[in-house]
Amino acid sequence: YATCASVNDVICHGFPGKYVLQDGDIVTIDMVVNLNGWLADSAWSYAVGQVTPEAQHLLDVTKTSLYKGIELAVIGNRIGDISNAIQTYAEGEGLSVVREFIGHGIGEKMHEEPQVPHYGPPHRGPRLKEGMVITIEPMLNIG
């Protein structure tokens, strides 16, 4: 699997290239690991040097929205509970949720059911069950 490096306004799945990171950039590293046929997917965004206050706000709110979603990822809750927690927090902080890319189930395949959007009403979608493995990958925009 590829390691993706997305810089600044590239939301996700960017590929490493010849661009040299500059002070003030944001870079997101997205990696997939295969261990004995089971996949793991992780992405994290980093500030390069000093970023603007607006960019730092984006990083901080995205991280907090991830943890707000994780807090609701418990057996018996629904996917929509996670989705709504992310959207509610992000929009309350003046950011918008990217709707073109979502989280997903993961296991022996990279993209499995259920889909995990980062927006939508609570109490909807599949119930979380023991043994279910999902990715929660909030992607937010300024404005």
Q: Residue ranges of each PLM-predicted region?
A:
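Active-site neighborhoods and metal-handling regions in enzymes and metal-associated proteins
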Residues: Y1-G143
